[in-house]
Design a protein with these regions (language model features):
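Structured-RNA-binding interfaces characteristic of tRNA pseudouridine synthases
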Residues: 1-172
Length: 172
């Protein structure tokens, strides 16, 4: 945990509702590689993933759309704006980084489960479109395990800034 700045919050400040962007990271260690010191924050799988196919599928998730099929116990508004879904690979480590204005419960883990299906060759990248178009819960409610998920960053609007841009262009 790193604290980069500390300021008093205005009266009535609600950190959940006033966040502009949230960034989650999900770590996957593939090919049977094991790192005992990281096992509580990394999903370890035996499969080799097609990272290029995962990137193609991730690109189809970006934008403003209804994500009801990727949330659990969905109540209320289910439209979210995904600014970025980035899949990167370094050796056997695959990182999925998701930036959005808000998330539904279990949404990121469901997105990762969907990307894992693509990476394993069980679903074509364009299959993501069909999943997102459906109102039923994707993958029969399955989500990736929580151990790979980390809330990496929350961005709040700084005084005097407009409500535009992504986390990379704003102050935290």
């Amino acid at each position: 945990l790193v604290v980069r700045a500390l300021r008093p919050a205005p009266p009535g400040f609600d950190p959940r509702r006033e966040a502009r962007w949230r960034v989650y990271r999900y770590r996957i260690l593939m090919n049977g590689t094991r790192r005992p010191l990281e096992r509580h924050r990394t999903l370890e799988i035996d499969d080799r993933l097609d990272v290029e196919a995962m990137r193609a599928a991730a690109a189809r998730m970006v934008g403003e759309r209804d994500f009801a099929s990727l949330g659990s116990h969905v109540h209320g508004r289910t439209v979210r704006h995904l600014a970025e879904v980035r899949v990167t690979r370094r050796g056997d480590l695959v990182d999925v980084r998701v930036t959005a204005n808000a998330f539904l419960r279990r949404m990121v883990r469901s997105m990762v489960a969907l990307l894992l299906e693509v990476g394993r060759g069980r679903l074509a990248p364009d299959g993501v479109d069909r999943v997102l178009a459906g109102n039923a819960r994707a993958l029969h409610g399955r989500a990736a395990p929580p151990r790979g998920l980390t809330l990496e960053r929350v961005v709040y609007e700084a005084a005097g800034q407009s409500n535009q841009g992504t986390p990379e262009s704003t102050t935290t």
